[in-house]
């Protein structure tokens, strides 16, 4: 099981975990579009209703997301996998530590990729002076 799956599954099941980590999880940290869609939809639901979505509620919300049919199918398959794989709570301390490390690693990775893009002039709106020494 990947840490992304564990994170998303616990966002659905563990309210204490969700309230602690959701403000720090960015969509950019997730690799697949399905993971990004589920993360964003959970975040929107929690913001709107101040509670965790059930699998059924999330499924209904996902039907409203503007994605193509193939992405929708992948997203629903991932949701099913997450629901099956995350049937019990993991230790909160371990979850928080693992999620913090995941966020740090992804933030560093994204910064390196963006810096390479700036150096390669792929992003002409960014100045090379933005890269820290």
List PLM regions with ranges.
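Interdomain "pre-motor" coupling segment immediately N-terminal to P-loop NTPase/helicase cores
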Residues: 83-133
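Noncatalytic partner-interaction/assembly domains of nucleic-acid and motor enzyme complexes
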Residues: 1-102
């Amino acid at each position: 099981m990947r840490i992304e799956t564990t994170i998303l599954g616990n966002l659905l099941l563990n309210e204490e975990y969700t309230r602690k980590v959701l403000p720090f999880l960015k969509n950019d940290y997730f690799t697949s579009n399905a993971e990004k869609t589920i993360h964003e939809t959970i975040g929107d639901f929690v913001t709107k209703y101040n509670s965790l979505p059930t699998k059924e509620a999330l499924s209904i919300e996902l039907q409203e997301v503007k994605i193509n049919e193939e992405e929708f199918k992948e997203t629903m398959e991932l949701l099913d996998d997450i629901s099956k794989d995350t049937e019990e709570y993991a230790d909160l301390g371990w979850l928080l530590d693992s999620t913090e490390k995941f966020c740090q690693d992804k933030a560093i990775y994204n910064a390196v990729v963006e810096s390479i893009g700036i150096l390669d002039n792929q992003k002409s709106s960014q100045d090379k002076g933005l890269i820290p020494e």
